[in-house]
Structure formats: structure tokens, C-alpha cells
């Protein structure tokens, strides 16, 4: 057993099993405390909520509570290992919600026979929570599940594997294009992978200005094109009317490569076929589509991002999902819509262009960081993230009409 594996197991097992717990927010030391907390005092908020359902936000924790829900069919890079095996990941997500955005979470692992069973189960318990984070659900079922739950629930439903990845990728890519002197409207983009993250990334990039006809998506059978007869409805959206069939054909002259597929699928020779000043986001974890050392040896005009923390430009969903929910819940949004996602993209993009505080340098164990090829995305430990992203998302929710209440006074106003 490797040292790191044992350390990871010990971290989860000691001093008590798991990573999260429930803490009390009210005193419970006296008989009177208990009378207020439960019977008979609890009857008063019950009556208030029955009379005015919105009072549930006044008298319970609903407004700060997120459900983290999975069926374990696509756990990290490990695959379909079932609901119970996903529990450490869901607890980890809850830890990140609390650590970075002060949000409480409950992890829920669902065993089900059909996709509709899963949808019905989640929809039945949705009103308990202020928002729902879907996690580690395989494609294409994840698309159907999220769509159905958004339609049935009046709280935010967000599949982070799709949209969190898309938001961080889009923010980093917009900055990389700016540094390389290229425009997203003209960029030729190759996407290796056609699952949940890949499709969401490309759809969001289109909303940022990318042209659908400039995108070449590949799955395990090669280029997704209009003459293929084996495509599901989601891949069909990216079927390109082209005679190109291989990675080598589509990557020749390409400006951008986005990998959300598997390890070692992009070679140094492939990279050399790309246009001048290429951009590579090799996001497969733990091993990227091309190792950064190999990529940087092949091209010295490259901007490279990966999902790894030990190299520059880590594409990490923790840069957005805690803060998107923070902003959405704080205005009681009924959904997380495209305007809110784009607001998060631009908040992240803009933050990376600002001077970096000393505390971030210390946490990242570096002496300096400045906007450039090795710093296109903020660092996860940047304390400004919550305020910037949550505020942008909350404002977008209000302006797009999905917020139930106005922006709180001085909401994350710096210096306010």
C-alpha cells in the first residue's frame, strides 16, 4: 500500500469516520431551551410556515442547505461503482461547500432501477433543500435527469460535472485566447470527449462566442460528423458537416484542444499540428490527455491547463460551484440559468487579471503570480472568489427574473 493511499484512508477514518457532521445553531442546555427547540415551542414556526410557506426560510435552515445527490454511476475516473461507493465523494463535496461558501450540505446516495425512479425520488424530497447539486451521474442519463428535475423543482438544480467544468474551462479559455491574441469567434476548437462535461463545455463556449461549426468533437469512434448513424441526441448537436474523420485531421491548424476524455490521447506529434500559439486544456484526471512536460517540450508557444494541482492553470470546479450556490441561495433563486453561469464565467475571468494577494501566494506555495500563460485561472484558495462569483451570480439571478428576493444590502460589496 502506498503512503498516499494509506494517508487518504486514515484521513477519512480518523479520528472519527467521514468528513462532515451536524452542529447545533441554537442553545440546548436547559429545559426551557428544549421546550423552545421541540415541543411545545416548535409548534409556533410550524403554524407560521403553514400560514406563509416562505417563512420556512425564516425559521429553518432551508436557505443555507444543499443536497449533494448521486447514484454512483460515474464516480470520478473510477466509473460505475454504485451509490455507496460514491459516499466519500459526496461527503467531500459537502466539505467544499462548507469550507469555501459556508453552505451546509447533506449527501444523498440513491439506489434505483430506472432513471425515472431516480427523478421521482429526488423531486419528492427537493423542498427540504435550498438547492440540489447532482454529482457523478453518467451520460446520457444525466442530461435527462437534470432537465426533468429543473422542470419539476422550484429550487436550483445543478449538475456540477457538466456546468462547473464548463464554467471554469470557459473562464480560463477566454483568458488564454486573450493572451494568445486570438478571438473565440474565430477559434478552431477540437474537443476530445463527448460525455456530460464535454457537451456542457462546448455549449457554454458557444454562448461565450464560439461558433458551433468551428467545433470538432470526438468520441471513442472518432470525429462526430453528420453522416454517422450511431449518435444520441446530445452528440447530434455537435455533428459537424465534414469529411474529416481522425484526430490528426481535425487538430491540424486548430487553435484550441479541450480534453475531457482519458489519459495520453494527445501525442506530441498531434500537438505540433496545431496552429501557432495553441491552447491545450487536458482535463482528464488524474492523468491528462497529454502530460504538461511533454506538451511544453513539443511547443514553446503553448498555454496549457490540466485538472492537476501540481502544474499551473488547474481547471478545478471548486472555483465556482460553492459560490454559484451561495449567490443563488442568497436571493432564493428558482433555478441556475444561463445568465448566472455566464456571470460566473466573467467573474472568474476578470479576477485572474487582478493582482494576487500575498495570502494566495502563500497558500499556493509560490513567490509570485501574475496574469499570463501560467496564470489564467484564479487559485482555489483565493479568498476573493466567494464575494466576486456569488455577487455576480446573485445579480444575474435578480436581473434575469429567477430571484425571489432582492440582493441583500451591501451583498459582498468590497469595503462595504
Q: For the regions a protein language model found, what residue spans apply to each?
A:
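Rossmann-like adenosine-cofactor binding region
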Residues: 236-303, 308-310
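N-terminal ligand-binding/catalytic initiation module
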Residues: 1-157, 390-404, 411
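Adenosine-phosphate binding glycine-rich loop
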Residues: 160, 180-182, 284-406
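Solvent-exposed alpha-helices and their adjacent loops that cap or buttress functional pockets
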Residues: 57-62, 98-99, 124-126, 150-151, ...
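Generic structural signal for well-ordered, non-membrane alpha-helical segments
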Residues: 27, 31, 38, 42, ...
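General beta-strand structural signal in soluble alpha/beta enzymes
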Residues: 107, 133-136, 157-160, 217, ...
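Glycine-rich phosphate/diphosphate-binding loop of Rossmann-like nucleotide-binding domains
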Residues: 76, 81-101, 159, 163, ...
